[in-house]
Curated annotation (Swiss-Prot):
Subcellular location: Plastid membrane
Domain of life: Eukaryota
Family to which the UniProt record says this protein belongs: Belongs to the PsbN family.
Assigned keywords, A-Z: Membrane, Plastid, Transmembrane, Transmembrane helix
PANTHER family in the record: PROTEIN PSBN (PTHR35326:SF3)
InterPro entries, per database record: PSII_PsbN
Record organism: Cuscuta gronovii (Common dodder)
Main localization of the protein described in the UniProt heading: plastid
Protein name: Protein PsbN
One of the GO biological process terms: photosynthesis
């Protein structure tokens, strides 16, 4: 394969991996540990 093809595949894989990890963090099991600032200060905004 050419160098440009390998670089493109590497960067595409990196982007897909990062996106998958971000989705897992936002909606998967670790999301239970995230705090919700709107829920903490919900009464102050009214």
């Amino acid at each position: 394969m050419e160098l440009a093809t390998l670089v493109t595949l590497f960067l595409s894989g990196l982007l897909i991996s990062f996106t998958g990890y971000a989705l897992y963090t936002a909606f998967g099991q670790p999301s239970q540990q995230l705090r919700d600032p709107f829920e903490e200060h919900g009464n102050e905004l009214k």
